[in-house]
Amino acid sequence: MILNFIFNVFFLFIIFFTILHKNEEKKSIKLKGKTMGTYWQVKIPYVPNQLHIKNLIQRKLDEDEKLLSSWKKNSLVSKFNKLKKNQLLAIDKKFFKIISIALKINKKTYGKLDITIGNLINIWGFGNQKKPHNYPSINKIKQVMALTGMKHLSLISNANKHYIKKNIDGMKINLSTLGEGFAADHLSSVLKKEGIENYTISIGGTVLVKIKNKENSKIIAIQKPTDKIQSIHLLIHLKNKSISTAGTYRNYYYLKGKKISHLIDPKTGMPVTHNLISVSVISSTALEADGWDSALLILGFKKAKILALRENLAVCLITKKNNTFSTWISPCFKKFLINT
């Protein structure tokens, strides 16, 4: 979900993999911009009205950001965060879908994907609060954790109308682990309505590939998980699928000499510290790939491996010990792998 850049073309310095191009059409265009604190890039066949397409893409992404942002005061997320317990907030189908996927993955990952940890994200300096100069106290963490938990969040549907509510005051949600995937799927539907059938969408650490031609595919390079010299770790081919990568080695800071990752374990209230540093997930939708990667990374290697096998997930896990990388690839991921 973070740090993705296009190899030899345009580097997005906050992602984990690079897109290479196989059977690249000579007449193609690349549109790019900013959204959700990261970069987006869309590659499509040449169209004469490319300015219209670019403006349309940016407008739709701006709409998504207004929907999902924790920073914008009038976003649905911000409106929910201001609710008192048991108050209903009317939501649209798009918001209903993203919350439904979050609830689904939460149940399958022992609660590791938890969108109700907005307060935890804030006290660790990855939300709308500044990075702390001291570790949050145990009492502070316990106090904030009392305001988390997907069990305190409810979706309600009635006569084609959707609502969301919380059953405790002070709970805040944060959808940063799902926003890029959601936006990529949204752009896919937008391009389809414009009659565009072949495209590659990159938003942060998420890539979505659609190809009508039966033979062609895109080659994706999963980057070696290091914040130093960028190099290719694995190559895969992708067609009509999405891949999302989460990692601990880019979005972090040091506090009293210790590395603080942006990935917070909702069960402990603490940033993850284990040696699983990168997780890539391939799925039919970008939203699900984006949700699974962070949850699996928070789980740690052993539990993530067991879960990937149990759920038949296409997963690549990379661990690091003493500056040595080790890679585990699930059986479902192997069919995408390019042997080099």
Curated annotation (Swiss-Prot):
Substrates-to-products reaction catalysed: L-threonyl-[protein] + FAD = FMN-L-threonyl-[protein] + AMP + H(+)
Cross-referenced Pfam families: ApbE
Span of the signal peptide: 1-22
SUPFAM superfamilies, per the entry: ApbE-like
Taxonomic superkingdom: Bacteria
Binding, FAD: M36, W71, K112, L113, D114, N174, E180, I264
Binding positions for Mg(2+) per the UniProt entry: T177, D290, D293, S294
Cellular localization per UniProt: Cell inner membrane
Main location (coarse class): membrane
InterPro entries associated with the record: ApbE, ApbE-like_sf
Keywords carried by this UniProt record: Cell inner membrane, Cell membrane, FAD, Flavoprotein, Lipoprotein, Magnesium, Membrane, Metal-binding, Signal, Transferase
Disulphide bond pairs: none
The EC number(s) this enzyme carries: 2.7.1.180
Membrane topology qualifier: Lipid-anchor
Molecular function as annotated in GO: metal ion binding; transferase activity
Cofactor list: Mg(2+)
Cellular component terms (Gene Ontology): plasma membrane
Family as reported in the entry's similarity comment: Belongs to the ApbE family.
PANTHER family: FAD:PROTEIN FMN TRANSFERASE (PTHR30040:SF2), THIAMINE BIOSYNTHESIS LIPOPROTEIN APBE (PTHR30040)
Purpose: Flavin transferase that catalyzes the transfer of the FMN moiety of FAD and its covalent binding to the hydroxyl group of a threonine residue in a target flavoprotein such as NqrB and NqrC, two subunits of the NQR complex.
Protein name: FAD:protein FMN transferase
Annotated source species: Buchnera aphidicola subsp. Schizaphis graminum (strain Sg)
